[in-house]
Every structure is written in structure tokens, then in C-alpha cells.
Regions:
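Switch/coupling segment of Walker-type NTPase motor domains
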Residues: 36, 43, 68-94, 456-515
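Short, solvent-exposed loop/turn segments at the edges of secondary structure
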Residues: 115-119, 321-323, 408, 418, ...
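Contiguous hydrophobic segments
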Residues: 217-226, 339, 392-407, 475-476, ...
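Amphipathic, soluble alpha/beta structural segments
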Residues: 147-201, 403, 427-467, 473-480
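Glycine-rich phosphate-binding loop of nucleotide-binding enzymes
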Residues: 16, 35-37, 42-44, 50-57, ...
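Short acidic/polar mixed-charge low-complexity motifs
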Residues: 26, 419-421, 497
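Core mixed alpha/beta domains of very large multi-subunit molecular machines
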Residues: 377-422, 430
Length: 515
């Protein structure tokens, strides 16, 4: 079965697939930055599992959720902002040198693909209610229908903020520009090589998704390779053929924390009608009971107990059933590197409690799964390899993973993270007159580099302050002071000296309540 790629339009901060009428679908995306829990206590992992279960419970009948995860994000916008602040603020030669070195080094690493930034987006998709137009349809009724859907998406956004914001996560509703950029990057993996300063210049809201973003066809690969060739890259697809037999919080990190870039995960999720599922399971239980009465096989007895437990679990509301489709796509410039990525991904899937990955050998099947993973499009007519799974199990295998970046967008200083990422920091947070100082304590053994770290922060943030005062023991910052200002002289206070720091000095003023 061959399925053609879907098409739609960007507008009013939503995506409309196949028209705003009966048979069409409407979706909106949300960028989610969850708290980084890779090394967190199990208590926090369990809390995230509960939050994700609540997220699934919020899905309405006939609505679908698509989880889009990838690790091919770029740090270029943040680096350009950092560079702009250097040009605007830095006047000291040492500060300029330090900040420029950080910019050039990290820019080169980003271009070489050695930096890694995970991105997570949630798309909520629902069918267009054609009956809402009534017997006549006009511009006013279309605007009213769009307004109703936008309000529903707004409520979903508030729900997501309440769900993940309390744990330190961030949620941002995507705009037309965000939807366009996601599709442009998704369908054009070579975009970062073209050195385009502003991709939004190519956005035309009058054109469809394919006209805006789909600039080439998929060409089949020669055997024994599987997948297809598109936009200068070889693409390979993996789909979970069997899901993990059991799960645990954090099991998805086996897939999301691999040490290479250029692969993504798409999970399409649909709620299941519980009553219909119970009726179906009851019929199957009756059939198995009849087989057991005639054959008396232990295997049939175990199947009876499993189905009876499932019926009881759903009837009591202890869990809720969902159907999911789990798609993994990898791409690379060479076939050899793509094969290596697919092998590593298969091994990671196998480590997820005996899950199995299916690699479609037919180019048609690979393309169909690719079309099923387009952002926001979770109603594909290609229905292969959907699985029934309970809510807690679905929650555990969702790729809810993020890259810790700190205050990257308005960073005063930058450091490299442990997972090929950049972490930004600020000395004050807030807006306007509501700035709050961010106090810090640096801990480490002797020779671990505490002073080196602090000097780097001082060097990068010098341009934000009129002067810097350092009170320390041992003279570790004398070289830094002389480098920033050759005329600076340290004030040395010692036990047998003539200077002291009297914090009780009123400077000749009478005592007051402030003292």
C-alpha cells in the first residue's frame, strides 16, 4: 500500500491538513523543555511518569497526540546573541578576547556537528467538526470555528504549563513561524549547510506545506541498504514491532542519550474506547476458556488469567488503554555511517526490555512510515505497526528528554556541558526593576579548578559591570586583576598589618536601624 504525503496550510498559529471542512484535521504544536532527569533521584522520575500519565488522560476521544523528539538542534542563534553582546558591551581587550574565543570555538563545533541539542515538541491533532458550519458556510463561520479551536489549544497550553512548569520545565505554544521552521528542518536535513541567515524569508503563508518546505522526492536505495535518499542524505527507518515487555521510568534514555546526532523519534498516540476494548477482551476470554476446557493446556490457562486481569484493570479504572505507533528515523551523508547509526539504534531498542525494531525493506514502506512521522500528522491512512499499551507503560517509553541549556537565550557566560551541549548562565534574572541576583557556591577539591571556573565567569561578565571587587585568600586572582587592569593593585590584609576590614564602621555617621 502506497500512501501519498499529506498537505496543509500554516495560519493563525495552527496547521490545517486537507482543508477546514469535514474530513480535514487541525493541529498545533507546543515546544516543551522538561527538566533534565538523567541523573535525578527515582522520586523525580516517578513524578514525571505521573505527569505523563495525566497528559495521556487529558486526550479526548478522536483526538491524537504526536510526540516529536530529535537531537539536531543548533546553538547558532544563542551564539550570535552572545557575539552581539560582545560587540555592543565589551571594551576591555581581555574580555573581548575571552568572549570571542568562546564564540569562535563553539561556532566551529556546531558547524562540525559536535554539539548536540535535544528538542521536544507535542502536537495535538483533532478532526475538523464539519457540522459546526451549519447549513451555510461563510467567512464569519470559518473565523468562529478557528477561534473555537484556538481557544481549545490555549487551554491545552495552560494544562501543559501547569503539568510541567511546576517541576522546572518550560512550555511554549508554537507560532506559524515555528511550525514552518520545524517542517523546513524536518524535510530538509541539509538546511544547516546552506548558511541561510534567516529561513523565514522563504515563508509564504499563501503556499501549502509542500510548496513551502518539500523541495525534492525520495529515491530508493540499492540493496542491501534500506530506506531512501532525500536532500543529500541517506535516510533509514525503524519502527517498534514489539514494545517492551515491562518498563520503568527513564527507560527512554536508552534511545535519547546515544552519542551521535541526526536521528529523531516520532510517537503517534490515540486513546482507545475502554468499553469496546473490554467487550473485545471478554469475547476473547470466552473463546480461550472454551479452548482450555477441551485442550487443558497450561498456556491457555495463563492466557485466561492475563485477559481476566486486563479486564479487571480497565473496569476498575486502574489503567487506561492507548494505541501507539513508534517510529525512529536516522539520516547521514554516507551509507556506512547510516548503517552504523541504525545498528546502534537497534541495539538500544533491544536493551529496552526485549523490545524489537522492524526495519522496512521495501522503499514504499519506508516512505509510508516517513510520511506518518510528519510533524502534527498523526491521522495517516497507513496504519501498520500500531500497538495497544497501558498508560503507565506508554508514559515510560515516551522520549521526554531534554538538553539542559540554562539561561541560553540571554546568556552572560557560556560553558560546555557533559552531553555535547552548551549551558548559558546569568548573574541576575528577571526583567526591569525586578532583577534578582543569582548567588552561587563553587565546590571542589584542591586543584579541581574552582578559581579557573570563577575567573572564566568574571572574564565573560566583566562587560556587564562598572567594577569588580574580589575578596579572596591566597592571591589566586592577582593575575586576572592585572590582566583586566594593568594598574590595579591588590589590597593585602594580614594579621600583623596596618589595614583591617571593619564591617561595623559607620563612616562617621550616627548609628541607625540599618546598622
Amino acid at each position: 500500500m502506497r500512501v501519498e504525503p499529506t498537505d496543509g496550510f500554516f495560519g493563525e498559529n495552527v496547521i490545517v491538513f486537507e482543508g477546514l471542512h469535514r474530513g480535514g484535521f487541525i493541529t498545533r504544536g507546543f515546544e516543551v523543555t522538561p527538566s533534565d532527569l538523567e541523573n535525578a533521584d527515582p522520586v523525580h522520575h516517578n513524578a514525571l511518569e505521573s505527569d505523563l500519565t495525566a497528559l495521556l488522560a487529558g486526550l479526548k476521544p478522536n483526538h491524537r497526540l504526536q510526540v516529536q523528539w530529535d537531537n539536531s538542534g543548533t546553538f547558532r542563534p544563542a551564539l550570535l546573541k552572545f557575539r552581539g553582546a560582545t560587540v555592543e558591551r565589551a571594551t576591555n581587550p581581555w574580555t573581548q578576547r575571552v568572549r570571542n574565543e568562546i564564540f569562535v570555538r563553539n561556532w566551529g563545533m556546531d558547524e562540525a556537528g559536535r554539539l548536540r541539542r535535544e528538542r521536544l515538541r507535542l502536537y495535538f491533532t483533532m478532526p475538523v467538526d464539519g457540522d459546526a458550519f451549519g447549513p451555510t458556510r461563510g467567512r464569519a463561520s470559518t473565523a468562529a470555528l478557528l477561534s473555537a479551536y484556538q481557544e481549545e489549544f490555549h487551554q491545552i497550553g495552560l494544562f501543559l504549563e501547569a503539568l510541567f512548569g511546576s517541576a522546572g520545565g518550560r512550555v511554549r505554544a508554537m507560532t506559524d513561524a515555528d511550525h514552518f521552521l520545524h517542517y523546513l528542518e524536518f524535510l530538509n536535513p541539509s538546511l544547516h549547510e546552506r548558511k541561510i541567515s534567516d529561513p523565514l524569508e522563504f515563508f509564504d503563508p499563501e503556499k501549502s506545506i509542500q510548496e513551502n518546505c518539500w523541495h525534492g522526492e525520495c529515491r530508493p536505495l540499492e540493496k542491501p541498504d534500506t530506506g531512501f535518499y532525500h536532500d543529500g542524505y541517506y535516510h533509514g527507518m525503524l519502527v517498534l514491532k514489539s514494545l517492551p515487555k515491562r518498563t520503568r521510568p527513564g527507560i527512554a534514555y536508552l534511545l535519547t542519550k546515544l552519542g551521535f546526532r541526526d536521528y529523531g523519534i516520532t510517537v503517534n498516540i490515540e486513546p482507545v474506547d475502554v468499553e469496546r476494548l473490554i467487550d473485545r477482551e471478554q469475547k476473547e476470554l470466552t473463546r480461550v476458556e472454551g479452548d482450555y476446557e477441551s485442550l487443558r493446556k497450561i498456556k491457555l490457562l495463563a492466557a485466561m488469567k492475563t485477559k481476566a486481569a486486563k479486564i479487571a484493570r480497565y473496569s476498575n479504572g486502574d489503567s487506561s488503554p492507548y494505541r501507539i505507533q513508534y517510529i525512529i528515523r536516522a539520516w547521514d551523508k554516507t551509507r556506512e555511517d547510516l548503517r552504523a547509526k541504525l545498528t546502534a539504534l537497534k541495539a538500544a531498542v533491544g536493551n529496552m526490555e526485549r523490545a524489537q525494531a522492524y526495519e522496512p525493506a521495501l522503499e514504499t514502506s519506508a516512505r509510508n512510515f516517513f510520511y506518518s512521522s510528519w510533524p502534527g500528522w498523526s491521522f495517516s491512512r497507513y496504519t501498520a505497526l500500531w500497538h495497544d499499551y497501558d498508560d503507565a507503560l506508554v508514559a515510560n517509553i515516551l522520549p521526554f528528554s531534554s538538553t539542559p541549556v540554562g539561561h541560553l537565550e540571554d546568556a552572560e557566560f557560556l560553558f560546555e556541558g557533559a552531553n555535547g551541549n552548551l549551558v548559558g548562565g546569568r548573574t541576575f534574572c528577571g526583567e526591569g526593576n525586578s532583577l534578582t541576583p543569582q548567588n552561587a557556591v563553587v565546590l571542589g577539591t584542591t586543584g579541581a579548578g574552582k578559581s579557573v571556573l570563577t575567573i572564566s565567569i568574571l572574564s565573560q561578565t566583566e562587560c556587564y559591570y562598572g567594577f569588580t571587587m574580589i575578596a579572596e585568600e591566597g592571591g589566586a586572582y592577582n593575575v586576572y586583576g592585572k590582566t583586566v587592569d594593568p594598574h590595579a593593585e591588590p589590597i593585602v590584609i594580614q594579621a600583623n598589618g596596618k589595614l583591617t576590614m571593619n564591617y561595623l564602621d559607620t563612616r562617621g555617621l550616627p548609628l541607625s536601624g540599618l546598622h
